[in-house]
């Protein structure tokens, strides 16, 4: 994934707005986005491990780096799941890749979601982190619809250094996240 300069935001404006809004004394108090974690759980991997190869390839395409395969922490007999079995993949984005992904998410991906009217403002965890779920991976421009074998969802967690939800919501609004009214 090539990271272009026009795909980034003007952080001096974001910092100035947040300092004015929350009356921070120092620039170091201003919250920022720490990392973005993209997770795809694959329940079918219990019966067919080769399904994970497609998920890993799709995550690699949309994030620009290799994902890590996640394994089951404990056995659940009803699901025929044993401890240590591969059940998904995740990727953690920081730095320039994080910025490019957030830009792409807010400007390209979310508007392509079917029946999109804005994201919920209730998905904060109380510590300034935001969780977002997408039902289909085909909304990303890098994913070729013809090569997708099965439509899968994913979780996107945006971890911020904000102390509470109001600071984090204002930060993400300045990043361009389209929240519902």
Swiss-Prot record:
The family this protein is said to belong to: Belongs to the universal ribosomal protein uL5 family.
Pfam families: Ribosomal_L5, Ribosomal_L5_C
Function field: This is one of the proteins that bind and probably mediate the attachment of the 5S RNA into the large ribosomal subunit, where it forms part of the central protuberance. In the 70S ribosome it contacts protein S13 of the 30S subunit (bridge B1b), connecting the 2 subunits; this bridge is implicated in subunit movement. Contacts the P site tRNA; the 5S rRNA and some of its associated proteins might help stabilize positioning of ribosome-bound tRNAs.
Entry keywords, A to Z: Ribonucleoprotein, Ribosomal protein, RNA-binding, rRNA-binding, tRNA-binding
Organism: Aster yellows witches'-broom phytoplasma (strain AYWB)
GO molecular function, one term: tRNA binding
GO CC annotations on file: ribonucleoprotein complex; ribosome
Domain of life: Bacteria
Gene that specifies this protein: rplE
Protein name, entry field: Large ribosomal subunit protein uL5
